[in-house]
């Protein structure tokens, strides 16, 4: 790259820093997938080398190399993108420091920090008999992770995104969260990919057979649905599961595990009541921005008499299993997290969305 004279010296240095960060990022992905790995450092990888000749580096060596590479890249990368129309999405100082904080947080958790109560990894050694995993917990790793996160906050570049029009607390919370993924390059995003054509996601979450265009293929599990807290109490309603799979309920959360309510008004369509299982009521605004459940209406924004399309997933329902098609919702839920409510999915218009790899929240 130093031979590319069409670039300024500063541009060349930034590109080198981008490459250094991306190399560290992909090392981190390998580390998450496989645990401690072999580090080539600045050597050119020998593709012909035999795996039995090389050995894994230790957890601390992997983490130390990755986080230092990210920190060093951050010293050169720009604080903000000066030409966002052309270059938004390229790496910045905040991207490198933010991902570094995630690396350090990952390394501080018990799995890679002493192995917790079961001592995971303590018996693993390399060919030389050197332990690959830390042999005890180091509480300073949590401090280092917190300090790394504070460095990102102190850049004063990123802010939590808030909806600017709603006054109702539930709607404000719901739309603030939703807009993080539907408003292009909003102030909360640190590393993201913008999808101009939202079909890659939205068609696959629209309930099938209601409009003839949905596939209903991406569905949340019951455990994910249970993971959202209650709006009023802020408590998590399900704290675990019994041996038979039934949930353990926090009685102080305000959660109702049984029964149905007729005429309940969902935050997104308050002028049209629905019959709802009581467990769907009173949840955090992020729940209603993310989870579409049985009995809800899929809303079209054009104001016609067909604006509200009822969706039911049970046998014989409007979006139930059909023998002629493999497209059906197995869990009774679909996602609405990345779907802009202003798009009309009946017309094969899928809008856009942002996939966040790292954000301030």
Go through each PLM region and give its residues.
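Conserved, well-structured interaction surfaces
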Residues: 1-34, 49-93, 256-259, 276, ...
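Short glycine/serine- and small hydrophobic-enriched flexible loop segments
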Residues: 2, 28-32, 99-109
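Extracytoplasmic/secreted envelope proteins and their assembly/folding machinery
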Residues: 16, 63, 67-70, 97, ...
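TPR/Sel1-like alpha-solenoid repeat signature
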Residues: 20, 97-103, 360
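An aromatic- and glycine-enriched ligand-binding surface/loop that stacks and positions planar moieties
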Residues: 37, 41, 93-94, 104-316
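Short linear capping/connector segments at secondary-structure termini
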Residues: 42-49
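Glycan-recognition/cleft segments
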Residues: 316-328
């Amino acid at each position: 790259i130093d031979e590319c004279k069409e670039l300024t010296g500063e541009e060349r240095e930034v590109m080198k820093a981008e490459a250094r960060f991306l190399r560290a990022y992909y090392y981190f992905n390998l580390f998450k997938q496989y645990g401690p790995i072999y580090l080539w450092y600045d050597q050119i990888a020998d593709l012909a080398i035999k795996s039995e000749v090389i050995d894994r580096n230790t957890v601390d060596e992997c983490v130390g190399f990755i986080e230092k590479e990210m920190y060093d890249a951050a010293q050169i990368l720009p604080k903000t993108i000066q030409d966002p129309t052309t270059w938004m999405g390229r790496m910045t100082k905040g991207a490198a420091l933010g991902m570094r904080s995630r690396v350090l947080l990952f390394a501080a958790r018990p799995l890679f920090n002493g192995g917790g109560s079961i001592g995971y990894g303590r018996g693993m050694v390399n060919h030389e008999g050197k332990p690959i995993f830390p042999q005890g917990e180091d509480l300073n790793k949590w401090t280092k992770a917190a300090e790394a996160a504070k460095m990102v906050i102190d850049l004063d570049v990123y802010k939590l995104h808030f909806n600017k029009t709603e006054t109702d607390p539930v709607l404000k919370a719901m739309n603030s969260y939703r807009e993080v993924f539907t408003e292009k390059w909003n102030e909360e995003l640190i590393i993201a990919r913008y999808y101009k054509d939202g079909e890659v996601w939205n068609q696959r979450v629209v309930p099938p057979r209601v409009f003839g265009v949905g596939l209903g293929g991406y569905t949340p599990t019951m455990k994910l649905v249970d993971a959202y807290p209650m709006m009023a109490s802020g408590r998590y309603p399900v704290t675990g599961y019994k041996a038979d799979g039934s949930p353990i309920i926090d009685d102080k959360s305000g959660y109702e595990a049984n029964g149905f309510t007729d005429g309940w008004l969902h935050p997104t369509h308050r002028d049209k009541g629905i019959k709802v299982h009581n467990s769907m009521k009173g949840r955090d605004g992020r729940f209603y921005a993310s989870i579409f459940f049985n009995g809800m209406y899929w809303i079209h924004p054009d104001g016609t008499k067909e604006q509200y399309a009822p969706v039911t997933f049970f046998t014989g329902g409007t979006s139930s299993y059909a023998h002629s098609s493999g497209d059906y919702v197995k869990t009774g839920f679909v996602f609405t997290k990345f779907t802009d409510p202003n798009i009309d999915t009946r017309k094969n218009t899928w809008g856009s969305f942002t996939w966040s790899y790292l954000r301030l929240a």
